[in-house]
């Protein structure tokens, strides 16, 4: 298994996804607006509620309302966790599989995790070489969180929570029940980025810093070129070589190439 500095680890998706850039040549989060007022009750009641959530997560107006209403958003996340076991599994019904994918989307779209995924995919599509890692990192971190530690922390927490759902999904045997308006290509690219962020946290916790919160703080310092960060020189294993079994299942379900 290869090893590299933590700084380089933040751009591993550029190498992982470069081989499937044509496959990922779309914006996973771009959709027409379908305004709706989000209420927890709208999303309860089994398949119908999940279909409503899938539709609403495709609406920038509804997503903006969810961002502005953390009480409803947290209640919805909790509902998906307790009703469908999206972070723990087993995801042994089509509704549970769909709910896990929607849970990941909910967390990413109500933080800046969606923009991070899109920026990484854009870098894959436009970069001809990796070159200056600091420049690459600056280009993929969303502008609204790059200098805002509260926003950066929310984005990271969202990615870590989404990773739990993607790992639970990939622990099941494909094919999967994909929500309306979503593709397994969407899921694969988001799952890869979410897993990467969990891998970075795992690599520096507790060996460098004691808690996940501390790890996120150090990552914030790193992306802002703060010389007080403790992780820029840390050597860590490439989390995508080999690809872990849940991600392998997700990539296989998407028909996406990946390291063997």
Language-model segments: what does each one mean?
Residues 16-19:
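C-terminal motif of bacterial Sec signal peptides marking the signal peptidase cleavage site
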């Amino acid at each position: 298994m290869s090893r590299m500095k933590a700084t380089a680890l933040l751009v591993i998706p550029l190498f992982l996804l470069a081989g499937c850039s044509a496959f990922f040549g779309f914006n996973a989060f771009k959709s027409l607006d379908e305004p709706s007022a989000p209420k927890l009750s709208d999303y309860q009641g089994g398949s119908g509620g999940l279909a409503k959530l899938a539709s609403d997560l495709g609406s920038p107006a509804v997503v903006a309302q969810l961002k502005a209403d953390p009480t409803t958003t947290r209640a919805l996340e909790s509902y998906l966790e307790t009703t469908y076991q999206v972070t723990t599994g087993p995801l042994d019904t089509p509704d549970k599989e769909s709910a896990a994918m929607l849970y990941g989307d909910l967390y990413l779209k109500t933080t800046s995790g969606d923009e991070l995924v899109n920026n990484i995919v854009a870098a894959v599509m436009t970069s001809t070489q990796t070159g200056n890692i600091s420049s690459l990192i600056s280009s993929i971190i969303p502008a609204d969180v790059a200098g805002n530690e509260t926003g950066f922390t929310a984005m990271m927490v969202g990615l870590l929570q989404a990773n739990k759902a993607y790992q639970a999904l990939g622990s099941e045997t494909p094919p999967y029940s994909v929500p309306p308006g979503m593709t397994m290509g969407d899921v694969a690219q988001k799952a890869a980025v979410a897993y990467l962020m969990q891998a970075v946290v795992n690599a520096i916790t507790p060996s460098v810093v004691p808690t996940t919160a501390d790890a996120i703080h150090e990552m914030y310092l790193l992306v802002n070129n703060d010389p007080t960060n403790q992780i820029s020189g840390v050597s860590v294993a490439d989390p995508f070589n080999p690809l872990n079994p849940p991600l392998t299942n997700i990539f296989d379900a998407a028909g996406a190439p990946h390291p063997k």
